[in-house]
Amino acid sequence: MKNLFNFFKTSSELRLAYRLLKQINQKRSFYGAMTDFDLANQTNIFKKRLANGEKLKDIRVDAFAVAREATKRILGKTPYDVQILGGLILDMGSVAEMKTGEGKTIASIPPVYLNALLGQGVIVSTVNEYLAERDAEDNGKVYNFLGLTVGINKTEMDANTKRMMYNADITYSVHSELGFDYLRDNMVFSAAEKVQRGLNFCLIDEVDSILIDEAKTPLIISGGKTNLPAQYLSANQFVNTLIAEDFYIDEETKGIKLNDKGIDKANAFFGLRNLYEIQNSEIVHRIQNALRANKVMKRDVEYIVQDGKIALVDQFTGRIMAGRSYSEGLQQALQAKEGLEIEPETKTLATITYQNFFRLFKKLSGMTGTAKTEEQEFIDVYNMRVNVIPTNKPMIRKDEKDEIFATSHEKNQAIISEVERVHKMGQPILIGTSQVVDSETLSEMLNQKGLYHTVLNAKQNQLEAEIIAKAGRKNAITIATNMAGRGTDIILEPGVTELGGLYILGTDKAEARRIDNQLRGRSGRQGDVGISRFFISLQDQLFRRFTNFDQIFGAYGQTNGAIKGKYIHAVLLAAQKKIEGFNFDMRKTVLSYDDVIRQQRDLIYAQRDILLQIENFDHYIQKMIIRAVDIILSYDFIILPNQEIHYKNLINFLNDNLSRITHFNFGQIGIENYPIEQLNEFLIKQLETIYFKQIQSVLKENLGKTYFESERYIILSTLDSQWQNHIDTIDKLRSSANLVQYSQKNPYQIFTEEATKKFNILVAESAYQAIVSLFNNSNAEKIEYIKAILSDGTAISYPADSPQEIIDQIIASNEERIAAARKAKEEKQPEFIEKQLAKLKIEKVESGEEFELWKIGDSKLVNLKKEMPLDEKQNILVKMQQEQLEMMSEEEKNLIQEQNLEIVEIEEIEEEIQNENPQKVEFVDFKNDPDAYNKLIFGADYADKQLISSEEEDNNEKTNINNNEDLERTKGEAQQTAKNPNE
């Protein structure tokens, strides 16, 4: 009855998964009896079923059963029922919470295999490249056995390699690179340059880390550097003059701002009348960054200094965030604080949050050891339910009560004492810290006690997996920041179970209970014994920021030893729940702001995709001309306040901006004859005529059929430039929205209204700027060409105004090419001739000192002088071979005709040859053109073209020999090219 009750407590998804699991298990013996070939061939069968109209759910049971059997055969591991349950939840587009050590990697194989059968690509996202490589290599063996391809997307790969990886059936990638590739794909100028092939299904490993912990951090591609080191140094110098009474810090939000005393000091320092006047916004911005860098952010907590550079530290994982930097000048403020070289500030070119990127996938699922506490956020933001998958074996780890102390010093002393006690027994212990500085403090204290240990923090990131894997050995003491080594199992060494398993010791509480549970979960995998305990102090950040610290510390601050009583534990739990809610609200705020940008980004990216696909921009350009005219006629120096037109200003403006290439004079078309109500339509027609009749016709003449690529480039680059300016403006607008007070309006409303206005300006301005660029397209200039005849008779063309040194280079490089072709021909000729003779059944059978004996066909022999050039020997031998043609069958003649050999009738061949070449041939001679038979063999343009290699000739037998008409046609094409060099 208890199990039945638990069954109905589960979600509808999990209940469905149990029913499907039963059906999958019933297929076990059927697929288990198949040969490897038959099992692997099920992939083809499934694909045919899908092609015939069936859906994934129709083949789900069979596909899961096949994947399970393949995993057993290839990896030697049979997926447990709970792993199949987890896989089914993943296929449903939900989150599977599976405890550490329950085999999430194996659980992912069936759903990934099933979804890859659609042929639209499946992406498996991981938190680091080590895990991506490991899982791709291990699981890839199963997928390869089943006939699917696997790719690994890495940061350092070039675009071609990335494209190949994404085109695989299944692609493994670190999550950040997926987002950056998406942004880069929407900055290309050709659809063929894109690397991703659509966002179909993504399975996210450690989904809470990516979609919750990193949700607030946007992905940013930067460029357009601005170098103003003096301003950062000045702001840093000012902040260092401040004392605590000059500014206010909000402990909860970590926000900071100057108070009245600080503002007075700023006015005096920078020589200002009022710091917050609009013209001082840049100074305010740099002061805010300097305040945050110096008074809020801590070295070895939020960042470290490594090799003279600022390296960001992920606050949830403790890992270095490689390749990432703070934006909007904060990175430069930190560099000024630390006395480092100040790098140029960059401009945001493209940005997206993880929240909005992963919501682009048609289907999204994830797996983690801890997600249930964040289920509401997964539902609200990603429409994903969290299903807790039961463990394969009962969990027997002991989670002890927290030990709470008054001060950090007392806490650290208690930690060292506990480590000494546990270490004496030989029990391995993993000490989890949230900050690099804490790990180094404890490490120093252990060194003083002579306790050998290993430290894993952001500074030893590359050794992460190796260090964590060894944490289960006897006597091992490991210090690790937060979730370092996540995804790597800690295997207990033989004998450790008897010692009590792995001891997890947490040194403070995280901002989310979920993170604490992840640390606990490193112990007690697959029914192993283990223990976990947290050591806390009232001076920890959690108490300082999210409790009534003064009251709590006043009541318990003088306590010696661990603080007892339920109240203090209740305060701790309440503080964690409070900060969880606070962080959730922050992520929702980030998402709400980014949703405004997302709608605009979707419109721009959709427009880019259209522009990448079309090959005729006429309709698009017509619409842009209409927008451009609207903008021109909105300028107040053209349309005066009284609605009168300043025709002279208008004509000058048009001539200055739209006539640089055509030199068209807008003053000669009677603009001044059109009143304001007719002027708009008149200008539109005039600009259309100028562009399509003049500019575009020259483009076609100069660039040929690819003229539209020039138009595409101009339109795209203009759109990108305006969009990038817009993003940069929006970023500053978002950061300043909360600082501006508007009556009866909230910051989000202000941001939305301003962002919408600025987007409308972007659309109009990009159209206008594109028209200006199109009308001034340098490719539309009239160019006169002249030609030069090369030594091989071909012609090359170049612009008449080309510099002489460029012309000389062009001619020289072409002559080098011709010389190289001739040399290659000479080197290949002997080999090629002998191969051709062999095809005609002519071969050398004996070679003496002076003569060579050649066999022609099956019955004729001829002796030729050895010193005779090979091409002359060829002429004679081929001619001799013709004597036998009359004796050939029709079938043999047809065969020769198929080889493009001309059958000729020759009378008294031996007598003719003997009379004309008595010195070189004992009894034969010839009288025809020496190249006549070469042309029979090699084609009518034999003397003009390079001999192809014998390997190529084998594959192109019918194209090696051309007739005289081919030569004439080739010469005609060369002449035509000289007239139209750009085609």
Curated annotation (Swiss-Prot):
It holds the Pfam family SecA_PP_bind. It is found in: Cell membrane; Cytoplasm. GO terms for cellular component: cell envelope Sec protein transport complex; cytosol; plasma membrane. PROSITE patterns: SECA, SECA_MOTOR_DEAD. It comes from Mesomycoplasma hyopneumoniae (strain J / ATCC 25934 / NCTC 10110). Its EC number is 7.4.2.8. This is Protein translocase subunit SecA. Disulfide bonds: none annotated. Residues 973-983 have a biased composition (Polar residues). It is a peripheral membrane protein. It catalyses: ATP + H2O + cellular proteinSide 1 = ADP + phosphate + cellular proteinSide 2. Part of the Sec protein translocase complex. Interacts with the SecYEG preprotein conducting channel. Has a central role in coupling the hydrolysis of ATP to the transfer of proteins into and across the cell membrane, serving as an ATP-driven molecular motor driving the stepwise translocation of polypeptide chains across the membrane.
